[in-house]
Amino acid sequence: MGGGGGSSRFDPIDTTQSSKEEICAIVEAAADWGTYVAAHTFNDRAVARLLDCGVKSFDHGFFISEETMRNIATAGGFVVPQMWGISPDMAKTPLIPPSKIDEVLALGEEFKDFGRQLLRNGVKVVFASDYVGAFSDAERARRYEIWWRTQTFDSNYEVLKQLTSTAGELLALSGPRNPYKDGPLGVIEEGAYADLLVVDGNPLEDISVIGGTEQWFDADPEFKLISTIHLVMKDGKIYRHEIDGRLSPEALTFEDYNYQGIIGDYIPDN
């Protein structure tokens, strides 16, 4: 924890936590294991201290200045925001007491350009779903987050990168601890992990085809099948296949299917 939290009873959101000596010791210990450190933080003072020690990933960060954003970008850091936290729909959550609703709406209005500012200052952004409350609400929040980011970053393409290739870059910083050492994640290229979705539609135009929805608390939980996703492949194994009208939820190797007959027509040569 580099600072407090939004829903923490004894942990004010504006605070800076852990001394520089403590943080640097944590980063040194992580480096000894060949990996990096992520920190939960919201403000400039906390981020400056964390950057000085070599922290690479910053959760939330809503209150940081554009100068701090540029410092993160220069240091090769990543910001992992939870954009639902500055959504006007936050006022509808049962987790927010009525006395706090006006404050939540005011914060959302004040920091409505946070996503655009991150991109403008060259910060790499990764998708995440930090949430409080019931598990089912967290599942719904994840799908809402996908949609809400398309509104706050003004780009479906950017959101898709946050979900895939940029997240793969961050995970690669874990070095020997990285469970995906055999190739890059989140890209389609020779030598990369064969992680693919085949969907009915174009997520660059309509993010709902991969599950994004502007519904939140009244949305279906994520564990229900998304009808527009017809094939799920992870590391070359097919976990779900509906392209020819059949559902195959079990893991099957790539060779178990007639690639040209079943999959080839759905993936362009380029």
Regions found by a protein language model. Name each.
Residues 52-54, 72-73, 94-95, 140-143, ...:
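Short, glycine/charged-enriched secondary-structure capping and boundary segments
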Residues 49-50, 69, 90-92, 137-138, ...:
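Short Asp/Glu-rich motifs
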Residues 41, 50, 71-73, 118-120, ...:
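Extracellular/periplasmic catalytic domains that process cell-envelope and extracellular macromolecules
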Residues 20, 50-63, 134-151, 193, ...:
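Short, electropositive alpha-helical surface patch
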Residues 3-113, 124-134, 200:
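Active-site core of metal-dependent hydrolases
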Residues 242-270:
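Intein/HINT protein-splicing elements and their conserved insertion hotspots or analogous self-processing inserts
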